[in-house]
Amino acid sequence: QVSVMPVREAVRRLAAEGALSISSSGRIVAPSLTNEKIEELASLRALLEPELASKALPRVHNALIDKLVLINSTIDQMIAKKDVIGYIKSNLDFHRTLYLRAQAPITLALVETVWLQFVPTIRALYEDTPRSQAPNYHRKILSTLRVGDEPGLRLAVRADVTNGLRMLL
């Protein structure tokens, strides 16, 4: 028999991180995002994620680039299958795989907290208006990684994260 305490603790943690809301009656819901909140989250991503990518760049190697190419192919497959959850998971996996190389766990934890807050809204948006093709930003990120172009990498990551969230406004 499994105790409900771990579930309760997980729900409390997600609520503390802004991914869930708990009403006074105990009802649990994914909070809807206002335009102001979306803009704030987009600003945070635009600040933090290019920094993580930049810190990761000196530790990028061919095997990592190959892994990112594979993840990007999975993103294309998820879009073709109209698998919204698979698309979101693969997209976040692409970013997380790169950012882990930054060896900046505190910054990565902040970024993941931001992701938690907007994923339910993105899921609803993509279910209403599914993508027909993958955005080109990941390809730009990959090309900058291949040549070690740090300013280009920062720009590509910033464009990727801000344009993705701009769809929500």
Show which residues each predicted segment covers.
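Short linear motifs at protein or domain termini
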Residues: Q1-P58, A63, L165-L169
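Acidic active-site catalytic centers that drive phospho-/nucleotidyl reactions
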Residues: E9, E49, D83, N91, ...
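Mobile beta-alpha loop/short-helix "lid" or hinge segments that flank ligand
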Residues: A15-S21, T113-V114, P130-S132
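Alpha-helix N-cap/N′ positions at the starts of helices
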Residues: S25, L48, L70, Q133-N136
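Short amphipathic alpha-helical segments at helix-loop
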Residues: A30-L33, A56, I79, I122-Y126, ...
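Conserved amphipathic alpha-helical segments that form helical-bundle/coiled-coil interaction surfaces
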Residues: K37, L41, N62-R123, N136-S143, ...
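Short helix-capping/hinge motifs at transmembrane helix termini and TM-loop junctions
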Residues: L57-P58, Q103, E127-D128
